């Protein structure tokens, strides 16, 4: 299937991105075949990301009644894959949280992604050039949250910075239960980011993400920022011949 075909078009906005250094060994069982864990200056990162999904359209044109605007919170890490002379830098999702069952079901069926649906809330507030964004979800009877506050104006990440590394991975990879790997392209312009002056993440990480992650969030994130976001296109997936 050609990557030129768009499966889903939307806007991703107000992306809270909290980034934690981890031992790459904890990611081993999540790494899809044909990919390898990516690193930045010798360190491996996982990211907790909360954001708004807005104006969602199937095939780039078909509006989805009652499902066009919603929030998502995910835990992801970064991989790379060689395609000929090209190195494709991508994202693997450990878990993705959305508020509607239909969205989770479509994503699981089409991409094999690890979606769950639970009640969610958000607070977005702007003050001057700054921004505060918080995303909350209810899991097993308790509310959890990811939050960041920024007081400065957003700027494009510096070339070669960690912020650029985190935001500019334009491929997604999923390991299917049958051992195959799914690859898909995500298209968007570079995002401006606010550097966070404060951040907060609360979750039962071991239960939600797996025992590998229960100790990953005891320390503050290595970096925290809010990405402005943009229009995005998620292209049809393909199964890799490995």
Q: Each predicted region: which residue ranges?
A:
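Extended, compositionally biased
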Residues: 44-98
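Internal, well-folded beta-alpha domain core
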Residues: 74-242
């Amino acid at each position: 299937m050609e990557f030129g075909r768009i499966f889903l078009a939307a806007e991703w906005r107000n992306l809270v991105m909290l980034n934690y250094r981890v031992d790459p060994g904890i990611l081993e069982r999540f790494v899809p075949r044909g990919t390898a864990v990516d690193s930045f200056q010798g360190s491996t990162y996982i990211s907790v990301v909360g954001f708004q999904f807005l104006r969602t359209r199937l095939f780039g044109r078909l509006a989805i009644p009652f499902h066009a605007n919603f929030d998502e919170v995910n835990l992801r890490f970064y991989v790379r894959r060689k395609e000929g002379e090209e190195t494709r830098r991508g994202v693997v999702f450990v878990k993705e949280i959305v508020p509607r069952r239909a969205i989770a079901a479509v994503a699981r069926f089409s991409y094999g992604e690890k979606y769950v649906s639970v009640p969610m809330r958000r607070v977005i507030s702007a003050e001057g050039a700054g921004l505060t964004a918080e995303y909350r979800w209810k899991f097993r009877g308790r509310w959890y949250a990811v939050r960041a506050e920024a007081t400065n104006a957003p700027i494009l990440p510096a070339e070669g910075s960690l912020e650029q590394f985190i935001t500019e991975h334009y491929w997604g990879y999923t390991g299917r239960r049958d051992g195959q790997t799914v690859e898909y392209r995500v298209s968007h312009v570079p995002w401006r980011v606010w550097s966070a002056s404060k951040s907060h993440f609360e979750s039962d990480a071991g239960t939600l993400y797996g025992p590998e992650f229960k100790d990953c969030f005891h320390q503050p994130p290595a970096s925290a920022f809010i990405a402005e976001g943009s229009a995005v296109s998620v292209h049809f997936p393909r199964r890799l011949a490995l």
